[in-house]
């Protein structure tokens, strides 16, 4: 991952903090504000539960900070009008797929101490054009089993932390076991693939769902999307992989491309962490990355931190 040269955060820098107060359980609003004020930020706090984001974006700031899970991060960044503004992530969710894909992990205090305003990495924004209009995403767009999994997860009681990841993977395994194969037409840069699948995910980052590395070749800023297909014939292999996804590559078929077209019917679709039902009606969607990329701050080690010798 190539980064721009580091520079110190400016004392008194104006930062707009978008916070989801219901995300996570280890860092409160006061914890985050204290960490940022300790680093000499002039902070304007906004709760994503109460705010009009468009109005909030109009306020001048030098840095935009998002504290929350993948849903909050995607909600704010896909609507950000000025992608030249640097953004910083404080991951407070369960999977934290977007932050994880950028190598960002830690408590708010640990992360704030490592921010350098010019140490950024670009992040693609995906776009979907379909009958409902145009939508943007950061993590992925898909149809079939993952979308049905999200619908089922919304109905269940939410656990916290690693326990939630474990329960999420168990629920996905249950969905995979009962998933009805669907006929899909997939076009990648003009080449068509037709088949019977449990689902397909068009991914912008390596991780999705309950912290699963499905698109290990994905690069967050190459303008390419990874098309991950769940072959009906490999259902049992995928069920077994979900029990220990850290031990092996996912048993999926993955291809890359710039312009993806999906044609499907009678199954749900998902956009990041939101799922939408679709029964009977044929849908056609074109998926690609937008030209303008986001600028995300990447943590840098403090000079006093030494690598541990092996």
Residue ranges and their predicted role:
Residues 142, 146, 201-215, 275:
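Glycine-rich phosphate/pyrophosphate-binding beta-alpha loops
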Residues 27-28, 75-77, 98-100, 148, ...:
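Short glycine-/acidic-enriched loop or helix-start segments at secondary-structure transitions
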Residues 188, 194, 219-225, 229-310:
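ATP/nucleoside-binding phosphotransfer catalytic cores, i.e., glycine-rich phosphate-binding loops
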Residues 146-149, 194-196, 207-211, 235-238:
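Short acidic/glycine-rich loop or secondary-structure boundary segments that cap or lie
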Residues 15-17, 30, 35-39, 44-46, ...:
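Catalytic core of DAGKc-family lipid kinases
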Residues 1-67, 74, 78, 109-113, ...:
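ATP/NTP phosphate-donor binding region
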Residues 157-166, 208-236:
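Gly/Ser/Thr-rich active-site loops/lids in small-molecule metabolic enzymes
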């Amino acid at each position: 991952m190539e980064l721009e040269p580091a520079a110190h955060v400016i004392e008194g820098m104006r930062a707009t903090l978008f916070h989801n107060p219901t995300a996570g359980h280890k860092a409160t609003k006061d914890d985050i504000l204290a960490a940022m004020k300790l680093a000499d930020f002039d902070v304007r706090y906004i709760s994503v539960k109460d705010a009009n984001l468009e109005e909030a974006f109009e306020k001048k700031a030098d840095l935009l900070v998002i504290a929350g899970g993948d849903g909050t991060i995607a909600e704010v960044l896909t609507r950000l009008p000025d992608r030249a503004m640097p953004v910083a992530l404080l991951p407070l969710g369960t999977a934290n797929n977007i932050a994880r894909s950028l190598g960002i992990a830690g408590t708010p205090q640990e992360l704030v101490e490592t921010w350098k305003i010019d140490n950024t990495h670009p992040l693609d924004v995906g776009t979907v054009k379909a009958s409902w209009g145009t939508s943007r995403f950061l993590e992925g767009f898909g149809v079939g089993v993952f979308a049905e999994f999200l619908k089922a997860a919304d109905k269940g009681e939410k656990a916290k932390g690693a326990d939630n990841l474990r329960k999420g993977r168990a629920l996905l395994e249950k969905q995979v076991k009962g998933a009805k194969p669907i006929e899909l037409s997939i076009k990648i840069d003009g080449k068509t693939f037709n088949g019977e699948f449990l689902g397909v995910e068009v991914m912008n980052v390596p991780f999705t769902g309950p912290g699963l590395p499905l698109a290990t070749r994905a690069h967050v800023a190459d303008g390419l999307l990874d098309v991950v297909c769940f072959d009906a014939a490999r259902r049992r292999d995928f069920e077994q992989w979900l029990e220990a996804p850290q031990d092996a590559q996912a048993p999926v078929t993955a291809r890359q491309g710039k312009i993806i077209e999906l044609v499907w019917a009678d199954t749900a679709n998902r956009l990041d962490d939101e799922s939408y039902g679709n029964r009977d009606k044929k849908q056609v969607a074109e998926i690609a990355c937008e030209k303008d990329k986001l600028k995300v701050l990447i943590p840098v080690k403090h000079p006093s931190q030494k690598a541990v010798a092996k």
